Amino acid sequence: MTNRIARLFPGAAGLLLVIGSAMAADTGDVKNGKLVYERYCMSCHGDQGNGQGEAAEYMSIKPRDYRQGTYKWRSTPSGSLPLDSDLEHTLFNGLYGTYMPTWKVLDERSRRDVIAYVKTFSPRFATEKPQEVIVIPPDPGYSDASVTRGAAVYLKYNCAQCHGAGGQGDGPSAHELKDDWGNQLVPYDLTKGHVKCGDQSTDIYRVFMAGLSGTPMPAFSDSLSSADAWDLVHFIQSLSPGYAKNVAGTVANNPSGDKK
């Protein structure tokens, strides 16, 4: 085909090669991604992407099984596949409180390539497309009034059942929780001052609306208003006094409430 195009349109074949290379670079190179995966990821996630690498048995929080295409951090609705940018977010930032570290040591190309390879473990990526990104409205700003309202939201949605009245992960159901693969889970301690999927206020908001797929943490997008969600974000931030103080100090110059 390429030879025929070259005869009919001199120079076009070279252009197609350039375009093809650009597309490969944009979507990631699976072959190179496999090499990156084997070097950095396989010891935990396994050679089949099943979360059963050699190191997995020593981990209290088990590595993710990639075969179902189920990921904790997503900008898409519950049940949807993540975007490539979501997977890159996890690679770049890690998941605080788990064994998933940051992989800032990897350059952008390597991250893109390993994402392309990881996606081959689940047939969902070949047959489905991610749903539209969850829209996050502007943060109205951290305030004592918002924290008070957020405490009421925390009670209304029974967050204390898992996370405990003080947010320390010691609720009545804390010892009964398991992930989709039957592994024991401990609810996150919200008083640590760091949040598993990112410290930005938008990250916390997103978790409320998207949930954490594969875990008992549900999505509240169908029942939680954006105003209540922001109040709940501010309440969660208030559980760690040092962190809340830092957030409050940024509001005047950064209305979104996000730390820069």
Q: Model segments located where?
A:
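Inter-heme linker and motif-flanking segments adjacent to c-type heme-binding CXXCH motifs
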Residues: 50-51, 97-101, 117-133, 145, ...
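Sequence/structural segment immediately N-terminal to covalent heme-attachment motifs in c-type
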Residues: 27-46, 142-168, 175-180
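Electrostatic cytochrome c docking/interface patches
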Residues: 22-36, 125-155, 194, 243-253, ...
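Bacterial N-terminal signal peptides that target proteins for export
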Residues: 2-12
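Extracytoplasmic electron-transfer domains, predominantly the class I c-type cytochrome c fold
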Residues: 57-104, 111-114, 118, 176-221, ...
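Sequence context surrounding c-type heme c attachment/ligation sites in exported
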Residues: 31-39, 148-160, 198-203, 210, ...
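His/Cys-centered metal/cofactor-coordination and adjacent catalytic loops
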Residues: 24-29, 43-69, 125-143, 189-190
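Bacterial N-terminal signal peptides
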Residues: 10-20
